[in-house]
């Protein structure tokens, strides 16, 4: 069974290995689409240092484990959608362990989030929202396959935003 827990910068220092260029054959994609050339520790530190730039409810860096194996890291944001005043679980990015890419773990994690209706840390959102790099074909396909609908694209056409209503 999947387990979500908060990232711990001391306990999870090994996750920085995922950003090393020789860690896996998918490293270029990992850097381009998920890490933006930063380590997981740097992403975490950025969230801690800039709370005013984050979600309106909270932002967390989550480690996903399966049988004690760290399989992914997700940055989640809970916020209120100003259009309809609904609670939203935002996912951006989801980073599957590069050695486990293309083995179904990303799909399993997103399906699990849908199954639990996005409820993490006692928050129950009305929808799940995902920001995806326009060139990340695999990720776009995954979210579309799981029923997410494209709701907007950034003005610079770099990112797509997908949404799935889960709790009315």
How would you describe each model-predicted region?
Residues 133-152:
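Conserved active-site alpha-helix within GNAT-family acetyltransferase domains
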Residues 77, 129-131, 151:
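Solvent-exposed beta-strand sheet faces enriched in polar/charged residues
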Residues 1-3:
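Extreme N-terminal starter segment of soluble prokaryotic enzymes
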């Amino acid at each position: 069974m999947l387990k979500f827990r908060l990232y711990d910068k001391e306990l999870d220092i090994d996750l920085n290995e995922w950003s090393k260029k020789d860690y896996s054959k998918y490293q270029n994609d990992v850097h381009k689409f998920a890490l933006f050339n930063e380590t997981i520790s740097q992403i975490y530190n950025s969230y801690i240092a800039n709370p005013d730039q984050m979600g309106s409810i909270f932002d967390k860096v989550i480690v996903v484990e399966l049988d004690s194996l760290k399989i992914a890291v997700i940055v989640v944001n809970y916020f209120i959608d100003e259009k309809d005043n609904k609670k939203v679980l935002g996912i951006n990015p989801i980073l599957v362990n590069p050695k486990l890419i293309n083995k179904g773990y990303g799909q399993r994690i997103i399906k699990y989030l849908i199954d639990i209706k996005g409820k993490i840390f006692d928050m129950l959102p009305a929808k799940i929202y995902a920001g995806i790099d326009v060139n990340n074909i695999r990720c776009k396909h995954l979210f579309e396959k799981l029923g997410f609908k494209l709701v907007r694209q950034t003005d610079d056409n770099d990112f797509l935003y997908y949404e799935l209503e889960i709790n009315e």
